[in-house]
Regions:
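Conserved MFS/SLC helix-loop-helix module at the cytosolic interface between two early adjacent transmembrane helices
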Residues: 62-98
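Cytoplasmic helix-loop-helix junction between adjacent transmembrane helices
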Residues: 106-144
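Extracytoplasmic
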Residues: 10-42, 236-241
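Extracellular/periplasmic helix-loop-helix junction of adjacent transmembrane segments
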Residues: 32-62
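Juxtamembrane intracellular "pre-TM" segments in multi-pass secondary transporters
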Residues: 2-4, 190-222, 247
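Helix-breaking motifs and short loop linkers at transmembrane-helix boundaries and internal kinks
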Residues: 75, 96-102, 130, 310-311
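Helix-loop-helix hairpin linking two adjacent transmembrane segments in secondary transporters
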Residues: 141, 145-189
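Extracytoplasmic gate region of multi-pass secondary transporters
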Residues: 29-30, 216-272, 331, 335, ...
């Protein structure tokens, strides 16, 4: 099946499901706090809830760089399957947690196991697709992430009727069963190394290859370009339901789905539109992917102000649509942009470092906004994140210039 002309799209469909579970399992907890704090009193403090969210991100971020290196050197099929099974087992186990410390340890293990997926999954898709379809393929895969984020928003709704414990147990079982499906249908692809005649020397030595990657100035611009928008990105994922519940004075069981569905549907549209636009623009301009991502980032700027200070349902839905659509356009082009600068046998490693930078930014902002919530400044601090997006947008447009000849197809 892996040699079939259509398998490149089959693998996108298979990994769409993994991406969905990856985000749904981590995101459910962000809307189930009201239900969980009845049984686990420590969660009544936003600062403690911030710690619970942040430990996942710190472990996930620390592991991401190593997971990319691992994915470039072993079977990505088995890495993906193992990662999915372990984090699903952790989700299942969270249904039996009785103390804050147990949840804390399980979230740390989840961060470790989930970190193994994204670099492996994206590099596998990038290898199966050429420049003509790469952004669209990545975009479809990323839409699985947004779908998972949306379904995660229903965690509070499901837990309201079936308990938060049973919610974790159910979705943990689903993930473990899906891992069995992947054993049957998922295939790996042999990685190609760009010929030296095209100007790129294969790095057979691990340390020299890593030094070559980390010594590249454009790579660090990409890292910055990826990390800074992660501040508002993770702020939205982890704290927007709380902000909207407070601003609109509605229950979290309503605010959770309202927030995540609005952002996720618009993000899904953004990755598809951004993917198609990027693939076509790239055929006539080597900076087409960069410009597409920049347009997406620009849309998040007014969205953050509106999200921070909005007090009506219209404000919230409008800001969620703008942010989701723009972030989707940005998100679908990160791996394709990386492919313009990094050899195929280093793509997972490169994306792993990007993920590490983005996650560490997310951990910082998640912890900070927990304290901001307790201090009553959540809305203002949300709006202030727009300024950092403006700065990185300018840096990206000035300094990120791909090779005139694309050799990393």
């Amino acid at each position: 099946m892996s040699t079939s002309k259509n398998y490149k799209w089959i693998i996108v469909a298979l990994l769409f499901g993994v991406a969905l579970l990856n985000y749904m399992d981590r995101q459910m907890i962000s809307t189930m706090r009201p239900a969980m704090q009845i049984d686990i009193a420590e969660l009544k403090q936003a600062t403690n809830f911030g710690r619970l969210m942040a430990i996942f991100l710190w472990v996930y971020g620390a592991m991401s760089a190593f997971s990319g290196i691992i994915a470039d050197r072993i079977s990505r099929k088995w890495l993906i399957i193992g990662s999915l099974f372990v984090w699903s087992a952790v989700t299942f186990s969270m249904g039996y947690a009785e103390t804050f410390n147990q949840l804390y340890v399980l979230r740390a293990i989840m961060g470790f196991s989930e970190a193994l997926y994204i670099p492996a999954g994206l590099s596998l898709i990038a290898d199966f697709h050429t420049d003509k379809t790469r952004s669209l393929a990545i975009g479809i895969h990323m839409s699985g992430i947004y779908m998972g984020q949306a379904l995660g928003g229903f965690g509070s709704t499901v837990s309201k009727y079936y308990s938060w414990q049973n919610t974790f147990i159910l979705f943990g079982l689903i993930g473990m069963l899906y891992a069995m499906v992947l054993i049957l249908f998922l295939r790996d692809k042999k990685r190609e190394i760009t010929p030296a005649s095209l100007g790129y020397q294969p790095n057979k030595n691990f340390f020299s290859g890593l030094a070559s990657l980390l010594g590249s100035f454009p790579f660090w611009i990409i890292v910055l370009y990826f990390a800074v928008p992660s501040l508002p990105g993770w702020a939205i994922k982890n704290w927007a339901p709380t902000l909207i519940a407070e601003n609109l004075k509605i229950d979290m069981s309503v605010a959770g789905p309202l927030t995540t569905i609005s952002i996720s549907i618009s993000s899904l549209l953004g990755v598809i539109v951004g993917g198609i636009l990027s693939d076509r623009w790239f055929q006539v301009n080597s900076r087409g992917r960069i410009y597409t991502g920049a347009i997406g980032l620009a849309l998040t700027i007014p969205a953050l102000f509106l999200m921070g200070y909005g007090v009506t349902v219209f404000h919230i839905i409008a800001s969620a649509f703008l942010f989701g659509f723009g972030f989707g356009m940005f998100d679908t082009n990160n791996m394709p942009i990386l492919c313009q600068f990094v050899q195929p046998n280093q793509r997972a490693t490169g994306y792993g470092f990007l993920n590490t930078a983005g996650i560490f930014a997310g951990a910082l902002i998640t912890d900070y906004l927990g304290k901001s919530t307790d201090a009553g400044n959540l809305g203002k601090d949300f709006a202030m994140l727009a300024f950092v997006v403006v700065i990185v947008l300018i840096i990206q447009l000035i300094f990120l210039k791909p090779p005139k000849t694309n050799v990393l197809s």
